[in-house]
Amino acid sequence: MITDCTTPSLPARDPQGHKGTFGTVVIIGGSLGGHSEAPRMMLGGPCLSARAALRAGCGLVVLAVPAPLAPHAIELVPEATVIPLPVDASGMLQPSAVAAALDASTKGANAFVIGPGLGLGIAAEQVLLRLLANTEVPVIIDADAITLFAQAHDAARDLRTSAVFTPHPGEAQRLAQGLELEIELGFIEGNHAARRALTTRLAQRLGAVICMKGAGTLICDGLHMWSTTRGNAALATAGSGDILAGIIASFAAQFCMRNATARASEHSQPLTLGEATALAVEVHARAADAWA
C-alpha cells in the first residue's frame, strides 16, 4: 500500500552553522570523447550539478572529473574543490586509480551525485559499481549512471547504500528492462497511472527512491509517494536534470545527515531521503515557475 504524502517544508537553517555544518556533496562526472581532430568534452553537466548544490545551501562541493577537464572545471565552479581523476592515453577513466583518488579525497562526503556527462564505457561502470558498494551516504544516480546501472550484471545491482535514481520515462523503462520487470514498453509517456505504477515497482525492487521526471514528477521510496503539479516547459532544456540532481544531493547532505539528529531539537527534524528528494523537486519546479 502506497501512502500519498505532501511535500515537507524547508527545514530551518542553523543560524550558528558554518560550511562544515551544511554538508559536503561530491559530484562525479564528465568525460572526454570524440577523436583527436574533433575532441569532445562533456563537462557542463557535473558543473551545473555542483553550482546547483551550492545554491541549494550545502557547505562544500567536491567536483571529481577526468584530469584533462580539471582546469576548466575550476574556472567554471571556482567555489568547488576539484579532484582530477586519472585517465589513460585515450582519455578513459582508470578505475583503480580513480578509486584511490576518491578514497583519499571524499572521506567527509555526506552525499554523492554520479552520472552527469560520465559516459557509458566499462570504466565508468566500474567506477559507479565500486562507489555503490563502498559508501554509506546517499548516492544520487543520474543521467549516464542510470544507463550503466541498468546494463550491469544483476549480482552487481544489489544496492548497499541509500540511493536516489532520477530517470526520465525512457531511462525508467531501461531500468525496468535491466531488472527484468514486465512492463508495456512505450506506454508510460503521458499515462499517469502507468508512470505511477512503474515508479512504485522500481522503488520497491531497488529499495531506493525513484524520482520519475516529467510533467508531474513523481517520487516514491517504496512506501510513500510524492508528486508536484508545479513546473513548466522551461524545464524542458539541456541541463535542468543536472541541476535537479545537485539540489537533491544538497538537501540530502544538509537534512539527511547523521548529525542532523543532534540539531533536531533546536532547529528541525531531519528528513528521509524521499522527503528530501520531494522537497528538491518542489524547489526546482518553483524556480521554473518564477522564470516563466
What are these model-predicted stretches?
Residues M1-P138, T147-V164, P169-A292:
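Small-residue (G/A/S/T)-rich helix-start motifs and N-terminal tracts that mark the onset
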